[in-house]
């Protein structure tokens, strides 16, 4: 059976920070995930100190779910917390119906 959920991730070169590329690309991925793949949930996580990535999630109106304590191990071996956001298909269609992205 196909998966009902996916994880959204992105990397942007520092040369292009602040131009909104992560937000625009993520909107396209969310649209494809919910409208074409019929996903029920898309998750997005980042390190607590990554304020830019948290801001992308906020601009996309991802509901905040909390902190996954010691949720990730880096290549260096260091264990880090993860800030967790997730959007359901219900959230997405409400955003689309009410045109909330356009109002931001």
What kind of region is each of these model predictions?
Residues 1-104:
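Acyl-donor (CoA/ACP) binding surface of acyl/acetyltransferases
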């Amino acid at each position: 059976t196909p998966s009902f959920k996916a994880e959204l991730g992105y990397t942007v070169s520092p040369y292009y920070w602040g131009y909104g590329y992560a937000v625009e690309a993520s909107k396209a991925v969310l649209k494809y995930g919910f409208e074409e793949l019929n996903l029920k949930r898309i998750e997005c996580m980042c390190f607590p100190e990554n304020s830019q990535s948290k801001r992308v999630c906020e601009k996309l109106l991802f509901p905040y779910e909390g902190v996954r304590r010691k949720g990730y191990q880096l290549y260096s071996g260091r264990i880090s917390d993860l800030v967790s956001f997730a959007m359901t298909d219900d959230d997405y269609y409400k955003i689309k119906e009410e045109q909330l992205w356009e109002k931001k």
